Amino acid sequence: QPEEREWRRKVVGELSRPDGAHVLSFSAGVDRALLERTVFVMQTWVHDLVRLKNASEPRHHVDCVPALKAKARRARLERLLALDRELLEARRLVSHPLNARLAAEHLMMAYNRATLA
């Protein structure tokens, strides 16, 4: 689906930024449906970062190896694992009637904390 690919591209572009995700501008347009897809893309991205930190190869975002390697160099493994747990919880709560924009902001800030050591 073109919309799905475009959203994945947008999320990956945000996660790839050397200076960290631009939390407010990215999160402004996130609704509940987009939040669910965002959490999924973030989970697969974080899994690839953890794999790189453990001297393995990325599994999900093989088209983004240079960006993943750059992020993995600065990321701390314990923070990535904490972020992975937070994303797992977010995925469980995505159907909850919370404010999707605020949830997206929170997750992107947590990502920045994990990858901008």
For the regions a language model picked out, list residue spans one by one.
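Charged, glycine-rich active-site and insertion segments that engage polyanionic ligands
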Residues: 1-117
